[in-house]
Amino acid sequence: MNTQQLAKLRSIVPEMRRVRHIHFVGIGGAGMGGIAEVLANEGYQISGSDLAPNPVTQQLMNLGATIYFNHRPENVRDASVVVVSSAISADNPEIVAAHEARIPVIRRAEMLAELMRFRHGIAIAGTHGKTTTTAMVSSIYAEAGLDPTFVNGGLVKAAGVHARLGHGRYLIAEADESDASFLHLQPMVAIVTNIEADHMDTYQGDFENLKQTFINFLHNLPFYGRAVMCVDDPVIRELLPRVGRQTTTYGFSEDADVRVEDYQQIGPQGHFTLLRQDKEPMRVTLNAPGRHNALNAAAAVAVATEEGIDDEAILRALESFQGTGRRFDFLGEFPLEPVNGKSGTAMLVDDYGHHPTEVDATIKAARAGWPDKKLVMLFQPHRFTRTRDLYDDFANVLTQVDTLLMLEVYPAGEAPIPGADSRSLCRTIRGRGKIDPILVPDPAQVAEMLAPVLTGNDLILVQGAGNIGKIARSLAEIKLKPQTPEEEQHD
């Protein structure tokens, strides 16, 4: 670390100059990798471990980080601090070694809180829409010339990274409620997009506990801070009197401080008007489909307006918004003749949504933008507990597509739960008499089982949070065409 870099560190986080080497366990995750990327750009020595390489680890290696694709005690040697993701168990050999060596072990959000401590922090929380809203706020602030630092849970496509170190005073970050670690953050501004039952194992299955945790998060704001909240959400509307901070509401509701009206979707773009108190109406063209994205944009505009950002900069940022990775991510449109001999094409869209509300929003956006297309979904449930807890909601939402192919549940480390598997979910959906789902027992069979159901005027939604994103990219690479054994060997 050279003198210039040390001077920069003293100006940003004065006491962290005592820290030289930061080690991340589970560094390949988007949230972990984003923080590591910011710290690498600040001049810290970064190392980390994960089980397999991915684009996040490659980006960090390009920045000079040392990455180990194993978990061994010697990996933490000489570390000043060890940062651990919530997915890592306490008996991980690196965690055990760090404790034995009396090296501090902290969670991801604690390190994010240190980055935020000496900046003007803007934290985006909520069950759905965090990643996209974080990207929208970051895009607006960048367009306004404010050069923000951002740390996002997904790839910000315009920047090509999950995180970026800016030279301005703003830090814009996604705040994760899945393990309640967002309580470490002390931002100046907090957005809450919505609150639904998810990650309930963290909250002992008690929804009241989850709601109180969001209130506690908002109470981390200083008395002069601001909470920006979606008043369309019934839980948020219920909690508003308990926030105890200055609030700005947004939504389609007539009493919203920033109100969305006249929404219309044309293809991948949304067009709507935003009504703000004491401001001229703002006519927005948003380069992202769906009413849910209009709400995300309204949250970003509410924050930017409060900061005094020029309307023209806001409008430019939203019209040119390139989205985030795996959020209604258009991967291509492919001719079907090589796939199944039919004329016409099929569009391929990859989406991370894995909660019934998110899946429903994606389906509605697809129907609104491409009403004449057959909607084909390849869905991978994520976690047995979520499938069990939201079973009926999944069954209801998934019947809205024209054709459904379903992979086995992605376990994310969980043990199987009887009745919360994909075969059971397919059986339940079939029993409702609207569609006949197709169970795909092996991911290698996806292209082969997808080809016969395509008609030549299709929109394929590849939906889920597990490893299904890799399957989507594979389908794009082979242009949906099932591979012969010879072609697979050649690949």
From Swiss-Prot:
<dbReference type="GO" id="GO:0008360">
    <property type="term" value="P:regulation of cell shape"/>
</dbReference>
<dbReference type="Pfam" id="PF02875">
    <property type="entry name" value="Mur_ligase_C"/>
</dbReference>
<keyword id="KW-0573">Peptidoglycan synthesis</keyword>
<keyword id="KW-0133">Cell shape</keyword>
<dbReference type="GO" id="GO:0008763">
    <property type="term" value="F:UDP-N-acetylmuramate-L-alanine ligase activity"/>
</dbReference>
<keyword id="KW-0067">ATP-binding</keyword>
<dbReference type="InterPro" id="IPR050061">
    <property type="entry name" value="MurCDEF_pg_biosynth"/>
</dbReference>
<dbReference type="InterPro" id="IPR000713">
    <property type="entry name" value="Mur_ligase_N"/>
</dbReference>
<comment type="pathway">
    <text>Cell wall biogenesis; peptidoglycan biosynthesis.</text>
</comment>
<dbReference type="Pfam" id="PF01225">
    <property type="entry name" value="Mur_ligase"/>
</dbReference>
<keyword id="KW-0132">Cell division</keyword>
<comment type="similarity">
    <text>Belongs to the MurCDEF family.</text>
</comment>
<dbReference type="GO" id="GO:0009252">
    <property type="term" value="P:peptidoglycan biosynthetic process"/>
</dbReference>
<keyword id="KW-0961">Cell wall biogenesis/degradation</keyword>
<dbReference type="GO" id="GO:0051301">
    <property type="term" value="P:cell division"/>
</dbReference>
<keyword id="KW-0131">Cell cycle</keyword>
<comment type="function">
    <text>Cell wall formation.</text>
</comment>
<dbReference type="InterPro" id="IPR036615">
    <property type="entry name" value="Mur_ligase_C_dom_sf"/>
</dbReference>
<keyword id="KW-0436">Ligase</keyword>
<dbReference type="InterPro" id="IPR004101">
    <property type="entry name" value="Mur_ligase_C"/>
</dbReference>
<protein>
    <recommendedName>
        <fullName>UDP-N-acetylmuramate--L-alanine ligase</fullName>
        <ecNumber>6.3.2.8</ecNumber>
    </recommendedName>
</protein>
<dbReference type="GO" id="GO:0071555">
    <property type="term" value="P:cell wall organization"/>
</dbReference>
<dbReference type="GO" id="GO:0005524">
    <property type="term" value="F:ATP binding"/>
</dbReference>
<feature type="binding site">
    <location>
        <begin position="126"/>
        <end position="132"/>
    </location>
    <ligand>
        <name>ATP</name>
    </ligand>
</feature>
<dbReference type="InterPro" id="IPR005758">
    <property type="entry name" value="UDP-N-AcMur_Ala_ligase_MurC"/>
</dbReference>
<keyword id="KW-0547">Nucleotide-binding</keyword>
<dbReference type="Pfam" id="PF08245">
    <property type="entry name" value="Mur_ligase_M"/>
</dbReference>
<dbReference type="GO" id="GO:0005737">
    <property type="term" value="C:cytoplasm"/>
</dbReference>
<dbReference type="InterPro" id="IPR036565">
    <property type="entry name" value="Mur-like_cat_sf"/>
</dbReference>
<keyword id="KW-0963">Cytoplasm</keyword>
<dbReference type="InterPro" id="IPR013221">
    <property type="entry name" value="Mur_ligase_cen"/>
</dbReference>
